UniProtKB/Swiss-Prot annotation:
GO cellular component: ATP-binding cassette (ABC) transporter complex
EC number: 7.6.2.-
Protein name per the record: Biotin transport ATP-binding protein BioM
Annotated organism of origin: Rhizobium etli (strain ATCC 51251 / DSM 11541 / JCM 21823 / NBRC 15573 / CFN 42)
Keyword Cell membrane tagged: yes
Pfam families xrefs: ABC_tran
Keywords carried by this UniProt record: ATP-binding, Cell inner membrane, Cell membrane, Membrane, Nucleotide-binding, Translocase, Transport
Domain ABC transporter: 3-224
Length: 224
């Protein structure tokens, strides 16, 4: 993971969503915490190109995300409500959907679908309908759909939100075992407690960039 923020900021008219930020992001696990409306999601959307900077630029693995010719295929995004990003009713069909747009052969698609499900021990989900899945199973299905396309960087937005203890533990194990670089946006402080680097956002600016223990302490000061 090599992400460079070069005085990158976002404004909507007079409202500043994210103050200009200069930051280098490398490594395997980055936590992102902050109160609602602090700029966390805007920060993440700049990385995958869903939001364009109004000042400065963001470079992901050597490519400017603001360039209209650039498709940020290096970045996969798991939204806070994974059921909303699963498009097709059957899990294996949804995983295949993103691969068909890559121009892969039928055999290649089938191999990737089987491979990504096996990676998470989720073969039993292949023929299940998305609306029948538990919260944890939905997270796994969404992860499979994104990871099948081969992104090197994964952004997870509130991955344990509204999960029971069993499904929360499942998602925690998956995140811990991901070989891909991961940026985890969360209010769940236990989830990022072991991370070497955590970013804290407050009122549209970066308030702290520290190891987890120090960053969590700073967040608690802000939230008090």
């Amino acid at each position: 993971m090599n992400i460079q923020f070069e005085s990158a900021g976002v404004s909507f008219g007079a409202r500043v969503a994210l103050e200009p930020l200069t930051l280098a992001i490398t490594g395997k696990r980055i936590g992102v915490i902050g109160l609602n409306g602090s700029g966390k999601t805007t920060f993440a959307r700049l990385i995958n190109g869903l939001t364009k900077p109004t000042t400065g630029r963001v470079i992901v693995n050597g490519r400017d995300t603001a360039d209209e010719k650039t498709v940020v295929t290096d970045v996969g995004f798991i939204f806070q409500s994974p059921q909303n990003q699963i498009i097709l009713p059957i899990v294996k069909d949804d995983i295949a959907f993103g691969l068909k747009r890559r121009g892969l052969s039928k055999a290649e698609i089938e191999a990737r679908v089987e491979g990504v499900l096996a990676r998470f021990g989720a073969e039993a989900l292949a023929d299940r309908r998305a609306h029948e899945l538990s919260g944890g199973e939905l997270q796994v299905a969404a992860l499979c759909s994104v990871l099948a396309t081969g992104p090197g960087i994964l952004i997870l937005d509130e991955p344990t939100n509204q999960l029971d203890l069993k499904n929360r533990a499942l998602v925690e194990r998956i995140i811990a075992g991901l070989p891909e670089s991961a940026i985890v946006i969360t209010h769940d402080l236990e989830l990022i407690a072991g991370f070497e680097r955590v970013l804290v956002f407050h009122e549209g600016r970066l308030a702290a960039d520290e190891p987890a223990a120090e960053a969590i302490a700073r967040y608690r000061e802000i939230a008090a």
